[in-house]
Amino acid sequence: MKSRLFSVILACLALASLLPAAEAERYGPGTRLEKLTIGATTYRDVRVKTVNARTVLFLHRDGMASIKLSELDPALQEKFGYDPAAEAESDAAMQAAIKEREARTAAAVAQRRAAQNQSQFDAMLRLFGTPAPCRDEVDLRPRFRELELYAKDQGRRPSCSVFAVVSALEFINAQSAGTPEKFSEEYLIWATGRVIQRLGTAVQDRSQAGDDADTGYALTEVVTALRTYGIPPESSMPNTIGRTKNITAAPSTEVITEARTNGQVAVHLVPGRDTATQLNNIIHALNAGVPIAIGTAWPRFSNMRAALLNSQPPAYNHAVTLVGYRCPTGKLEDTTFIFKNSWGAAWGANGYGFATYRYLVQHLHTAILLELQDRP
């Protein structure tokens, strides 16, 4: 009997000796150690809480510690079951989860911002036709500067309408997206030419403008091209507007595709039975922080001793972007509008000028209101 029992014990001991030593010595949650030395630091009264592919977390006499498994010596790495491949897989999964979470957050923020913008836009439209409250001043220029949307120079091509539309579009897009993005006037010039199958004639030296009209595209033609062809970032088709060049090279198919999928823009003519009503509605838009592209009669350059449209006789047509107004009396007829021009920052007040209500009520032709729509 004793001999048989002794044989069983020996067999058990032999079987135990065949088990991997590493398994018997593996550290994991619940493992208690009198001490654990990692590098130059010795932790005492250690109790392991968690072990994952990257780290081990444990309690010790003086608090809590989290150590990367990759920083352990090989013997401890083996005891904690460190596997570099498993760590890499865990890191990849973590990064993917972070990107997915960021994408969901960005989409939610964009959706909330779009809903808010739409609500504000609809509220503004509901005010059209009602008397607009004229404030002392509404000035979007500081926000334009903050977004680095400075006055551009159209060069010698008759493209003022393109620049006026793009200026308004860049601003409302930046307000909606939260970050500024510059768009390609070069592309929109090409697109407008495609839509109406014509090119404008080159503008002469503005210092001797006289009767030389900026006879390019009408605002309605430009916004038709915008709705038809879209618009890409400026980086996709940089502006190459020269001093005399009048023809724009066609963009690549890829750029056209990008432009058409870059979002949809709804275009509205500012309503009004007359220019006085239109200007009243423009005040509503500016109060809501929405710039307006306008087409108006324009005086001879020699008659503009200051960047102010007041009582000069008109000589030709031009397009600019209204970005604010001043009205110290609160009466619409005493308003002076602020506009952004496309003749460079050296013109006027850093590229901006002014137009009295009296001038615009007589000479305003067109006023365009742009509305961003959700991307498909």
Language model segments and positions:
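Positively charged n-region of N-terminal signal peptides that target proteins for export
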Residues: 1-4
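Active-site-adjacent structural elements in enzyme catalytic domains
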Residues: 135-138, 142-234, 327
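Bacterial N-terminal signal peptides
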Residues: 7-17
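Cysteine-nucleophile amide-bond enzymes
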Residues: 101-158, 173-179, 288, 316-318, ...
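Compositionally biased alpha-helical segments
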Residues: 20-138
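Solvent-exposed, polar/charged alpha-helical surfaces in well-ordered, non-transmembrane soluble domains
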Residues: 49, 53-54, 74, 78, ...
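Predominantly the structural core of cysteine protease catalytic domains
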Residues: 167, 195-340, 345-376
